[in-house]
């Protein structure tokens, strides 16, 4: 899993600027333990996760971030498991830069990438990146109607409690 590989590269060369990319299935499912321990260790790397809430490259199975009730190839009667919330997990495990972006807002996403890369310590940017083939629920239109920037709310980044509360919202409002 990618965050484990990135962690090893950083340990081998502390001067290297490490940027790791992956998907929600790899990062939060298959590599979930690597994600947790990289955050816990506050390893100085940037982890960008394309979160499409489905295993898109393996033809549409439920992923760790799939919503309850989502019909997929592996859950034809709907997903029955609570989705993992990578933002609250990262905060609670000690990541020192935690952000969420939406791929439809390229400027905001690029700004978060720059901030994450400049940050000293573990930075994670979870990017809502709709799968146009297998996730027909969480589409670009779905996110365009709901996404709001947390910084527009004058959020205090040191307020973990409010950050977690806002990260748990996934309905009419979704904060990035």
Report the location of each language-model feature.
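Short, well-ordered, mixed-charge alpha-helical segments that flank or form enzyme active sites
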Residues: 27-30, 54-59, 64-65, 107-109, ...
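Thiamine diphosphate
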Residues: 1-56, 111
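Structural motif
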Residues: 16-19, 44-48, 88, 96-99, ...
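Short, hinge-like loop/turn segments at secondary-structure boundaries
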Residues: 38, 63-67, 141-144
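Conserved thiamine diphosphate
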Residues: 63-116
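ATP/pyrophosphate-binding catalytic subdomain of soluble kinases
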Residues: 95-136, 140-143
